[in-house]
């Protein structure tokens, strides 16, 4: 909306520009002519050091977007707010799309998770709950969950919102809840969010040693 791109043209433009970025990273002279972009023998003066290019991770929340991630990127970046059962089904979609594109499993399969460690689950819920719940209430008002399955609305009581979605508890609790992501799905790059809007920094710092030393 901010760039006045009609909804019906956004995906096509995204795909077009992603391919252009990759060409600019790897080709000496790039020419392109479309409705929204004209390039005539353009060359990037400063190119990425990584060869052939930096890996591209595409986040995706629904089947078509996950298929696009398999087709156009080096890895599907798994979101932090889908429930475990949904991710299990989406992994099937992703793997099928990889096979259809004659691509092997990615070297890195990243996931982001909302995680907070404390001495036990009740304490973690009590401490992190107000900040994490507030964040997802805002997401719900923005309509961010409209791309999610109907039963995964963010407009739920916190106890229901957490189930199968966020990792809150003791280090042992967190470890047990994270295990399926690497044992079953092969995810090998974990990005953690443990500090949310309004949370004093010292509270997040209390969680971090438990994650780094005991998780």
What is each stretch, according to the model?
Residues 1-214:
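Active-site-adjacent structural elements that line small-molecule/cofactor binding pockets in enzymes
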């Amino acid at each position: 909306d901010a760039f006045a791109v009609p909804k019906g043209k956004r995906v096509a433009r995204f795909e077009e520009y992603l391919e252009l970025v990759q060409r600019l990273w790897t080709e000496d002279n790039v020419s392109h002519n479309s409705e929204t972009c004209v390039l005539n023998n353009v060359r990037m003066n400063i190119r990425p050091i990584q060869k052939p290019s930096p890996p591209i991770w595409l986040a995706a929340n629904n089947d078509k977007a996950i298929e696009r991630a398999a087709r156009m990127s080096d890895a599907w970046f798994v979101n932090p707010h889908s429930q475990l059962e949904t991710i299990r089904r989406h992994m099937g979609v992703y793997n099928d799309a990889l096979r259809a594109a004659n691509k092997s499993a990615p070297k890195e399969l990243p996931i982001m998770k909302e995680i907070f460690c404390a001495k036990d689950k009740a304490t973690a819920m009590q401490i992190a709950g107000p900040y994490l719940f507030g964040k997802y209430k805002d997401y719900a008002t923005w309509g961010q969950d409209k791309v999610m399955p109907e039963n995964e609305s963010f407009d739920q009581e916190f106890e229901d919102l957490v189930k199968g979605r966020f990792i809150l508890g003791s280090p042992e609790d967190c470890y047990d809840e994270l295990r399926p992501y690497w044992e079953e799905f092969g995810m090998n790059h974990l990005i953690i969010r443990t500090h949310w809007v309004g949370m004093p920094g010292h509270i997040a710092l209390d969680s971090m040693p438990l994650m780094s030393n005991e998780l």
